[in-house]
Design a protein with these regions (language model features):
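Divalent metal-coordination and catalytic microenvironments
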Residues: 4, 14, 28, 43, ...
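Active-site-proximal loop/helix segments of hydrolase catalytic cores
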Residues: 108-170, 184
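Metallo-beta-lactamase
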Residues: 69-114, 119-120, 129, 163, ...
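Active-site neighborhood of phospho(di)ester-bond hydrolases with catalytic His/Asp-centered motifs
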Residues: 13-15, 37-45, 63-66, 134-136, ...
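C-terminal regulatory/interaction regions
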Residues: 208-249
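Active-site metal-binding motif and surrounding structural segment of the metallo-beta-lactamase
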Residues: 7-11, 19-63
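Divalent-metal (often Zn2+) His-rich catalytic cores of metallo-beta-lactamase-fold enzymes
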Residues: 132, 157-211, 215, 219
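Conserved beta-strand hairpin/beta-sheet module of binuclear metal-dependent hydrolase folds
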Residues: 1-28, 125-127, 131-135
């Protein structure tokens, strides 16, 4: 979650699951901030947009990529089960294809769309003055291998491209907020990007060599990168996602 506040109002980036709304509102108030005026969803998944209905009813203006509204407005099937359409009040009311800029609290906040990556509706949020970048689930920082939701139009090659885009925007003082894990640096993101390139390269080469999924998993191409092996997405699960990119079922 990212929060920016000041005389122009409070901006919240992502809102987790609905039951957490009171805790989020309390944390915002503890910062001395006014109630959330603007809410940006980095993508449609429920752990980032589940509080939309609550914040929408409380008067927040919700913004997201065009495809976030499309997916939230219709029933979706994911690797973790079916997700029912959200009520109207939970849907983004301002949507965009390429991104937008907010001029609030003395900041230019750039909301940047990226090509299909974690999903087909990912956004990066860049506070240019504060030198802070929120990447949503384009970046999983060490607590798990990344989740590439191919059922939502995701593509691991897009995750690498998004990392490259953010690396070009960042410097050594930039604070990078991942979708999961601790706040990171440009060096952390570079290591993540290099890990993805290495794993994807190994898996793609193995697919071209005719190896089966089980043979590729036995190669352990995702091991040795310092990622929590028992996280939300395990090494084997991530290899399956990458394998499916190059050899769809």
């Amino acid at each position: 979650i990212g929060v920016s506040h000041g005389e122009d109002g409070t901006v919240l980036i992502d809102d987790q699951f609905a039951p957490l709304t009171p805790k989020i509102q309390a944390a915002v108030a503890a910062l001395g901030a006014s109630p959330v005026k603007f809410l940006i969803n980095t993508h449609w998944h429920g752990d980032h947009s589940g509080g939309n209905e609550n914040f929408g009813k409380a008067g927040a203006v919700i913004m997201a990529h065009d495809n976030v509204r499309v997916r939230m407005a219709t029933d979706q099937k994911t690797p973790f089960g079916e997700v029912k359409a959200s009520p109207k009040v939970a849907l983004p009311v301002i949507t965009y294809a390429e991104g937008l800029k907010l001029h609030l609290n003395g900041e230019e906040v750039r909301v940047i769309s990226v090509p299909p990556a974690h999903t087909d509706g990912d956004s990066v949020v860049h506070w240019t003055k504060s030198n802070v970048i929120h990447m949503g689930d384009l970046f999983f920082h060490k607590m798990s291998y990344p989740f590439v939701d191919r059922s939502s139009g995701g593509d691991v090659r897009g995750v690498i491209a998004a990392a490259d885009k953010v690396l070009a925007m960042a410097n050594d003082q930039t604070k990078i907020i991942p979708g999961h894990g601790a706040v990171a640096s440009k060096a952390d993101l570079q290591a993540y990007r290099d890990m993805l390139v290495a794993i994807v390269g190994k898996v793609e080469a193995a697919v071209k060599a005719g190896k089966s999924l089980e043979e590729v998993k036995a190669m352990k191409p995702a091991d040795g990168f310092g990622v929590n092996p028992s996280g939300f997405i395990t090494a084997d699960r991530f290899v399956e996602m990458v394998y499916g990119t190059f050899k769809p079922a």
